[in-house]
């Protein structure tokens, strides 16, 4: 969901929406650096005076105006808070067995768009991917980036967290609260007839 607004020429345009992990407050300045600044200034080619929407995961959207564009930074003025897309009252943690490459990315993307509150990757018996150390840290950063991008595109103002992977039996031994669900083709209870509390953990294979 991309909001609409007026350009500096009075033409209706799509307003770009970006994540920024800084405090945002109406009447205060904001600054984008690095990849965000490059994407906004060089890829999207916004100009001074253009409108942009920022969010930082606090559940709010913020209407901003571009004040200055430099090679590595973009300065903005935070004007006001905007109504954000409401979050689901059902808090779902997706417990996903780590899968290869694009399959894991697709799971994170689509579950974020559908309203998942958090992700807990797990190592199960059939998992083919095993990561440790710096490789695992880079993969976690990549996964979190996939989630952020899905929030930018879907209009969510709360960013689900991606936790560090644990072994499946370790997760199963932890007290998580709420209800734990495992989808099974031969189960006698269907999702349509089930009642859930406010917190659910959904385990997905392989």
Indicate where each model-derived feature is located:
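Solvent-exposed alpha-helices and their adjacent loops that cap or buttress functional pockets
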Residues: 24, 44, 86-87, 173-175, ...
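RNA substrate-binding interface of SAM-dependent RNA methyltransferases
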Residues: 79, 84-182
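A glycine-rich beta-strand to alpha-helix segment
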Residues: 194-206
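A short acidic, often aromatic-flanked loop/helix-cap motif at beta-alpha or helix-coil junctions
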Residues: 24-26, 166-172, 188-190
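Structural motif
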Residues: 16-17, 29-30, 51-52, 74-75, ...
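N-terminal positively charged helical leader segments and presequences
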Residues: 1-83, 134
């Amino acid at each position: 969901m991309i909001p609409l607004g007026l350009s500096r020429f009075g033409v209706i345009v799509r307003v770009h929406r970006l994540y920024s992990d800084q405090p945002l407050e109406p009447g205060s300045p904001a600054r984008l650096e690095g990849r965000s600044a490059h994407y906004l200034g060089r890829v999207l080619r916004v100009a001074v005076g253009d409108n942009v929407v920022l969010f930082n995961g606090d559940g709010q959207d913020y209407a901003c105006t571009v004040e200055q564009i430099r090679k590595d930074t973009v300065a903005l003025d935070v004007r006001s808070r905007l109504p954000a897309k409401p979050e689901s009252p059902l808090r779902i943690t997706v417990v996903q067995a780590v899968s290869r490459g694009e399959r894991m990315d697709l799971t994170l993307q689509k579950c974020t768009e559908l309203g998942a509150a958090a992700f807990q990757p797990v190592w199960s018996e059939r998992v083919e991917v095993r990561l440790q150390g710096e490789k695992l840290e880079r993969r976690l950063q990549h996964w979190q980036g996939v989630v952020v991008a899905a929030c930018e595109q879907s209009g969510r103002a709360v960013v689900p967290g991606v936790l560090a992977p644990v072994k499946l039996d370790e997760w199963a031994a932890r007290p998580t609260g709420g209800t734990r669900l495992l989808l099974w083709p031969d189960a006698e209870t269907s999702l349509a007839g089930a009642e859930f509390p406010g917190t659910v953990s959904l385990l997905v294979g392989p």
